[in-house]
Structures are given as C-alpha cells and as structure tokens.
UniProtKB/Swiss-Prot annotation:
A Pfam family that the UniProt record links to this protein: CLP_protease
Presence of the UniProt keyword Cytoplasm in the record: yes
Descriptive protein name: ATP-dependent Clp protease proteolytic subunit 3
EC number, UniProt record: 3.4.21.92
Keyword check for Cytoplasm: yes
Catalytic activities: Hydrolysis of proteins to small peptides in the presence of ATP and magnesium. alpha-casein is the usual test substrate. In the absence of ATP, only oligopeptides shorter than five residues are hydrolyzed (such as succinyl-Leu-Tyr-|-NHMec, and Leu-Tyr-Leu-|-Tyr-Trp, in which cleavage of the -Tyr-|-Leu- and -Tyr-|-Trp bonds also occurs)
Disulfide bonds: none
Amino acid sequence: MPIGTPSVPYRLPGSQMERWVDIYTRLGVERILFLGSEVNDGIANSLVAQMLYLDSEDSSKPIYLYINSPGGSVTAGLAIYDTIQYVKSEVVTICVGLAASMGAFLLAAGTKGKRVALPHSRIMIHQPLGGTSRRQASDIEIEAREILRMKEMLNRSLSDMSGQSFDKIEKDTDRDYFLSAEEAKDYGLIDRVISHPNEA
C-alpha cells in the first residue's frame, strides 16, 4: 500500500501555532528541492517555479537540488538546466541513489565546486533517445535531424561541465555509460563524494 506524501509539523515564523504541511513544502522553506522521479513537463515547471521563487527571495543563499532520477524528457530537463544557469543563487546538486540520463546532466549542471554525490550513488550518461512510430519517412527524417542536433548540444554542454573532450563525451554517450560516485568525480561530472550534510 503506498504511503503517499508524508506530512510534517511546521510553525510559521512569528506564530505560536503549528500546522501540518507536506514534506516537500517544508523542505522548500529550507531551500531544498527534490527531483525524485522521471523528468517531465510538470516536474520541470514545478522545479523552475520553485527555483525562481527562492532566487527572488534571497539570491545570496544557495538552493539545494537533490536528484534521484532515471532521466526523462530532454526539453523538460533543458528548462531546469537553463533555470539553474539563469538564477543568481548557487545551485548545489546532490545525487542520492541514481542520476541517469537527464538526471546526470542536471547533476553536472550545478554550480562548479558544489556538485556532489553520496558514496553509493550511480550516475549514467548516454545519448538522447527518440522514437519512430509508424510515420511518414519525411517526418522520421525531421525527427532524426532534431535528435542529432540535441545530441550534439547535450554532448557539448557535458564536455563544458566535465572538462572532458567532446570526442570522449561523444564516444562514452554512444551507449549507456555507468559511473560510481568516485568515477563520476574523476570524470568531472561532480566535484566531491560526501557522506555528511555539512560537506555539501
């Protein structure tokens, strides 16, 4: 039986009364965001809105983005990526569990020096996926060109974020490329492996 979203007590500043709020709302008050599912438009819109709000409240404080995601939509992920680059706040990215595909891309997109993973995390990079259902050949050709354009753009960005050469990124992302937390650090996708919150 699913447990649903847990609720936790929260006292508004200056108030004597506590009220129960969902845990994600409570974490958001502490500038902690969580990407714990497949990346889609709804998740992206929610994270973008939260980052913009937190940045407008106080851009001198970091935003913490915890990632445990198998990846998902490239366009939705790029909306999150662009927002990470856009906000003035530092964005600390923390991998807990799995950061695969777009999840790994977003992990690497955090503020340099602030990209971390817990010791048993797994990170996976690969090329973008695309489908060709029963469609006209010209439509398939258009989609293939767009996928190849996205692949090059993502690989160039991964090269910039990791310090690896474009050719190495292109070779490594040709198929699923799994890394441990330490391997991801050596590769340049993250900056540190941590085991305590104070290390982030």
